[in-house]
Structure formats: structure tokens, C-alpha cells
Amino acid sequence: MEEDDDMAATMEEIVAHAKHRGFVFPGSEIYGGLANTWDYGPLGVELKNNIKRAWWKKFVQESPHNVGLDAAILMNPKTWEASGHLGNFNDPMVDCKQCKARHRADKLIEQALEEKGIEMVVDGLPLAKMEELIREYDIACPECGSRDFTNVRQFNLMFKTYQGVTESSANEIYLRPETAQGIFVNFKNVQRTMRKKLPFGIAQIGKSFRNEITPGNFTFRTREFEQMELEFFCKPGEELKWFDYWKQFCKEWLLSLGMNEEHIRLRDHTKEELSHYSNATTDIEYQFPFGWGELWGIASRTDYDLKQHMEHSGEDFHYLDQETNERYIPYCIEPSLGADRVTLAFMIDAYDEEELEDGTTRTVMHLHPALAPYKAAVLPLSKKLGDGARRIYEELAKHFMVDYDETGSIGKRYRRQDEIGTPFCITYDFESEQDGQVTVRDRDTMEQVRLPIGELKAFLDKKIAF
């Protein structure tokens, strides 16, 4: 999608703001960086952790069906043989012969067609068809403008390394490209030890690695990324009911944390897009400044994964239904959310530059209080009031992430907190010494109320709940 000036500026503003305020830094920056690697700064790690906690709260803690898991990143290579990743986990790649730039062929074509006003899903088309489209629409290299490309070929996305001291094929091992397989191989362990009856789910948050051909768009597409995945197992024949349930549940989770409904859409996969093992897949997409992009993939994976691992391992994954005495391989619904993508989406959704009545502009991040890095900032009106203000800070810090700032005018301190999304500023003034009350300022409305110091914890507890 071709960016207009406003969109490009908005993305540039987000990247600049993220670095300036300690949300995200370029990786290995003092050595010139490493392409498409990013480090979460002090505020970014708090925001991302809060998002992960919010996901775990709704998908595991409050769910009667689901339990958690933390599987190893390194797995027996037979896992990836069984799952099909070694043979089929590929992206179509094409090189520009002129400038040697490497492109993911389906995305190159889709972007070029979108600029011509044509919407087409190219993912999943045969390689020969992609070559035909490149010629038919006279597609040029975005880097140099040349139209001289290599043939489209498949490129395996797995990162390969070696375990042990010798680099031989017998010691080949892979960084996992998804967290899901660690769940599938542990299906029986979890079901037996937790005495779970169908339907039930296994949730996991963890790092995955894909040697993407064309990563980009800040933290949207990177080679190292974090996933929040649920594999929900159910009786065959009930999978589409649960598929619809999880689609709605995932959308409601985003909305409950303040995401603008106008910025998200549910897009069903076409028959051509569907993975061979799926009988239904829907993406929840977010309207980023660079176009619509996938946040969450909800897929009905049937019994493909458990069957594959049964066949390759010899382990029996049949489930015995005690009520009906039926024996079957469970079907699986997978809602898979990118932690980095959804963190970026919440940052973009929250970012605002407001024009105030006095003609000035303030930058503010309207993050849901549950997600905000700091829940409150304690601000003594004068450094002379530091002792009393610090006592409040120390008490609140036992329960929340709280900032303390005594530098600069109170107005400038308010603006600093607005820019990082702190929902409440607590000002300790000279009257506080006498009446035991403080002024609490709301980030979004900028309205102020006086509250007794002893009521601050209950006030914040109520405000950050979701």
C-alpha cells in the first residue's frame, strides 16, 4: 500500500516517539544496529508485559477451560518434520537482477496491484502464476525501478543451528518458528496431569524465530518475535462453534482494552489462502499507517497436528470421552496473537496530538490504565515537599508501577506523563501537609480532584480494572 504523506509522517512520529520516550530502541545501536531488530526500553517492556498479563488474565486465569505451558524453544528436529515445517514452511522469493534486492514475491505483487487500485490475495498462488502476474502488470523493483527479476522460488524460513561441539547434519537443530508445536507434543502430558476433559485449551507466551525475506514496518514484522497462542481442543463436529466463539472473544478483548473498533476488521481467508489443514481461518487486522495488517490469526486446524505427531512419534493422542465412551482425536482451534504487533497497534491507537483551547498542542498516549507503563506519577509541588511525596510513592509502589518526578514546572511534568500514557498524576502540595489530601489529575480530561491520601490505592485499583 502506498503511504500518503500523513500516514508516513504518523509512522515516523510513532518510531521517533517510541525512541525518545524509552518505549523501543534500535537493536545493537552503538554498533550501527542490526536490521529489523528492536529492544524494548523501560516503558516498552512495561507496556508489553501489561499486554501479556491482560491476555493471560482473560485467556487463562479467568477461563475454566484453559491452562498454561512454557515449552522449550529448541525441540527435537523430528518435531518440525512431523509438523511439515521442514518441508513446507516456505515463502516465495524473487530477486531483482539489477540491484540484488530480495523481495517476498506475493507481497511485492500485492503492493504493486494495490497501488493500481486492484485488490488481490496472492498468498498461496502457484509460483508460475506469480511470475505471470509480475510480467502481466509490469511490476518494478521498489528499490531501483528495474523490471528484471529472477524466477520465483521457495525459501525456507527456519533458522538452523547446531547442538553440541560438531557442526554435522546429525547435530542440526532449529529455532522454533512458532510456539504451537510445543503445545501439541505436550497434549497428553497436560491432559493427563491436569485431568482435563474436552473442551480445554493450552496457552503459551514465548519467542519464535522466522528468517523473513522482507521484514519491516518497525516492530510489525521481525525475525525474532513473541507470540501469545492458545490451542483449544474440542470434539470433532464442534470446532466451528468454538471457532466463532474465539473469534468474538478475541475481538472483545481488544475492545475491552480501549482499541478503536473502527481500526480493526475481521477478514476471512479465501479458499485459496486456507492452509491445507484448516477448514476455517479468520484474521483480525488492524489499520496501521502502512495499511491493514494481521494482528491475530484464528484458525480451525482440525486434527492435523495431533495426527501428524501420532504418525511420526508413535504416541497415541486419541481421547476417550468418559460420558459417551467415544474415542477420537480432538480437533483444535488456534487463536494466535503477535505480542509485538499488538503492542505496536496499542501504541498507534493511543497516540494523539491534541490542540488545546489556549492554542498549544499536547502529545498524549490514551492507553487503557491497565496497559499504561506507569499507573500514576507522584509529583511534589516543590522539592521542599519531597519527604511527604516520597512516602506516598513508596506506599503505592508496593502495588503498582509508579513514577516519581520533582524536576521542572508542574505543567511540564504533566506533559511528560501525558506523553508516556500515565493515566493519573498525584500532586502533593503545601495543603497536603495540613489536610492529608492530594490533587489527582486525569490524563484524558485534564480534570483535577482532591482525594485523601489513604484512598489512593482503592482509587487506582478501581481505575485500572478491566
Swiss-Prot record:
**UniProt keyword annotations, A-Z:** Aminoacyl-tRNA synthetase, ATP-binding, Cytoplasm, Ligase, Nucleotide-binding, Protein biosynthesis
Subcellular location, record wording: Cytoplasm
Does the keyword Cytoplasm feature in the UniProt annotation?
A: yes
Set out the biological process GO terms recorded for this chain's protein: glycyl-tRNA aminoacylation
- What exactly does this protein do? Catalyzes the attachment of glycine to tRNA(Gly).
Origin organism is Geobacillus thermodenitrificans (strain NG80-2)
The EC class name is: ligase
Q: How does it assemble?
A: Homodimer.
E.C. numbers? 6.1.1.14
This protein is called what? Glycine--tRNA ligase
The chemistry this enzyme catalyses reads: tRNA(Gly) + glycine + ATP = glycyl-tRNA(Gly) + AMP + diphosphate
